[in-house]
Amino acid sequence: MAMLKQKISQQDNLSEEELGGFMAEALADIDVSGKKVLVIIPDSTRTMPLHIFYRLLHEQLGHRVKELSYLIALGTHQPMSDEAIDRMLGRSGSEIPRYRVYNHRWDDPNQLREIGWISKAEVEKISGGLFGEDVPVHINKLIYDYDHLMVLAPTFPHEVVGFSGGNKYFFPGISGPQILNFFHWLGAVITNREVIGTKYTPIREVVDLAASKIDLPKTCFSMVIKGKGVKGIFAGSPEEAWDHAADLSAQEHIRFVEKPFKEVLSVAPPMYEDVWTAGKCMYKLEPVIQKGGKLIIYAPHITEVSYTHGKHIDEIGYHVRDYFMKQMDKFGHIPRGVLAHSTHVKGSGTYENGVEIPNVDVVLATSIPEERCRKINLGYMDPGTIDIDAYRDREQEGILYVPKAGEILYRLNDQKTGQ
């Protein structure tokens, strides 16, 4: 694709007709006739009308390409069932062909190929001296069965990389564990408060550098979601499309408030099926919780801490960053991506002379038993005792109710210079 194409709604969201017109125009410029195309898409933990784009890609490419397939950029999330995939893509009862859809498996070495290394010198430069190690770059080798890669994905503020989307759908979306664990821990060391909603971060630099080692044609459709629809869409290289999407995401997905809150009821939507994914309900709110305040993750539907990493989290629990950094020898056997998740959920705080003092009291109001919540070093509330109405419309009292948490970032007015 020679140059960026974009379409932003001046009203609420783009209509299906507008999206169809945009995709037709953008795809007309891409040389994929007779070629095999692999489309990399998010899983169901991201809000996006994938069913619309599944239909549009069929209409625009189905007759042009030799093969059209999809790869779900799961990172370390659990594989999706056939039924869940059909729901996400709107395939149940549809006359659209059932194109092949693959789940990425980060933990299956047979699925991965090493495509290079990020050198110790590069790591030292990018991290400002925080880290000094050679990092191998592995990616799902399925991509090399195809002639052209397309990324079809939303962009939101993100706790590890700053803003999601773009090359993040390669790393960690369809990558191996080494680079994933490395840059998640790098993000955790810099901290969620510093990274989230910041456009260019050291972690984004790692992601883009790793993606530069993929020697295949790549086209990215980066979009910004408003509600359940598409506010804007950008087509181009992964770097360029993401760059513009991140700017629009900063306008649409960051809510500024005057002063911090003492208590937040953060409601996790059903798309978050465990604390691993529902942790976003903390990440997006941490910047507006006062020191000593409380955040409640309200999710009666959640029964598990992490379907993938629960064993490790049961062992280490949730702690502030310095709890790990000051005794890393004790946690060398734990994947650093798990340590990163732990400290992101727990939030900022101190660990001095063996005493841990978090800045925020994070409480789970889920179907996870109290005993397990205490064991993993989080608070517990019985969700059945919570009257949601009692939290509504009390912002002037320092109490915030967030009915669908996890995608909108909250910041204080004095943080408006963070882009």
Regions found by a protein language model. Name each.
Residues K36-R46, S69-G75, V151, V264-A268:
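Short glycine-rich or small-residue beta-strand-to-loop segments that form or flank ligand, phosphate
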Residues Q6-K7, E16-G20, V355-Q419:
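Extended hydrophobic packing segments that form well-structured cores
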Residues M23-L38, L61-V65, L142-D145, I214-D215, ...:
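Glycine-rich phosphate/diphosphate-binding loops that line cofactor/substrate pockets in enzymes
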